[in-house]
Amino acid sequence: LYEGFPNAMAEAVCLGIPCIATDFHAGAREILAPDIADSAVQIEEMTEVEYGILVPLCSGQKYRGKEPLERAEQELVKAMTLLLQDSEKRDYYKHKTSSRAKMLTIEGSVNRWLEIISE
């Protein structure tokens, strides 16, 4: 069972907060990368997409603190470091998420459904 729509991410986007998300089963792609939302290909490395950054899904295995990070965790570190150190990239995604927020309104959703139905 998976949550169909990540409300916290949608709220962050509406507030203009740059987002990093794992490429989980539902929601993140639809919000951050609508152009590839239908792709079945899983993200294998940190990927800058239109409205944020997607990283691979972690295994969920629990490790002790001294064990090395798994590859997906290293990709998450890269994404976090990028946004922390690159103010231009951070500002770019602040602007992009603000424009994406306008599409996440009720009106935007209704218009998109009407487009789909009329096709």
Where on the chain are the PLM-derived regions?
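C-terminal alpha-helical cap of glycosyltransferases
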Residues: 78-88, 103-119
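Short hydrophobic beta-strand element within catalytic cores of glycosyltransferases
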Residues: 18-22, 27, 31-33, 38-45
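Short alpha-helical segment that forms part of, or immediately flanks, the ligand-binding pocket
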Residues: 6-14, 29-33
